[in-house]
């Protein structure tokens, strides 16, 4: 079994079993015909971005880390919730005004550029204003509605 097959098997095993230790993982791999050392398993775990998370009983199990795409979308939502003052759709664009006069619009533009959204054509950022260019007016309205809903989630103390 080559390393790609072994790593695929590791993913399958952690999704179907509650594995607490590398030793347990090694035994399961061996039961499935994969011969590896503990050092190899440790490298595979790092390479696959597998981490341990506690369950309700306080025991920790290996799990597949959230994908980068999920993390980027969460970062974008957090940024919109915390830093955006207004969102306005104008034809096939969305104008976003940040709530801080600090150069936050370029950061927000980078987050938008990084998400996997086929409707977003590109972004242009100034200091506190961001222009999101979308493929059409319908996509712009949808994006604006999505962003406005996130802004409304902001808690005011």
Curated annotation (Swiss-Prot):
UniProt GO cellular component terms: cytoplasm
Pfam families: Arg_repressor (PF01316), Arg_repressor_C (PF02863)
Classification via SUPFAM superfamilies: C-terminal domain of arginine repressor, Winged helix' DNA-binding domain
InterPro entries the record matches: Arg_repress, Arg_repress_C, Arg_repress_C_sf, Arg_repress_DNA-bd, WH-like_DNA-bd_sf, WH_DNA-bd_sf
Protein name: Arginine repressor
UniProtKB keywords: Amino-acid biosynthesis, Arginine biosynthesis, Cytoplasm, DNA-binding, Repressor, Transcription, Transcription regulation
Species this chain originates from: Lactobacillus delbrueckii subsp. bulgaricus (strain ATCC 11842 / DSM 20081 / BCRC 10696 / JCM 1002 / NBRC 13953 / NCIMB 11778 / NCTC 12712 / WDCM 00102 / Lb 14)
GO biological process: L-arginine biosynthetic process; protein complex oligomerization; regulation of arginine biosynthetic process
Functional pathway: Amino-acid biosynthesis; L-arginine biosynthesis [regulation]
Gene3D superfamilies recorded: 3.30.1360.40, Winged helix-like DNA-binding domain superfamily/Winged helix DNA-binding domain (1.10.10.10)
Its biological purpose: Regulates arginine biosynthesis genes.
């Amino acid at each position: 079994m080559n390393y790609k097959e072994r790593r695929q098997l590791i993913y399958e095993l952690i999704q179907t079993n509650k594995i607490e230790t590398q030793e347990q993982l090694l035994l399961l791999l061996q039961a499935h015909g994969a011969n590896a050392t503990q050092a190899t398993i440790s490298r595979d775990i790092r390479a696959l971005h597998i981490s341990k998370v506690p369950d309700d009983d306080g025991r920790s199990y290996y799990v597949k880390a959230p994908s980068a795409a999920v993390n980027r979308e969460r970062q974008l939502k957090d940024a919109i919730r915390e830093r955006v003052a207004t969102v306005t759709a104008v034809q096939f664009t969305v104008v976003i005004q940040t709530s801080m006069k600090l150069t936050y619009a370029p950061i927000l533009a980078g987050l938008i550029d990084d998400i996997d959204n086929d409707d977003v054509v590109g972004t242009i950022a100034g200091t506190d204003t961001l222009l999101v260019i979308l493929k059409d007016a319908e996509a712009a309205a949808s994006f604006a509605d999505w962003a406005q809903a996130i802004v409304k989630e902001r808690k005011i103390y």
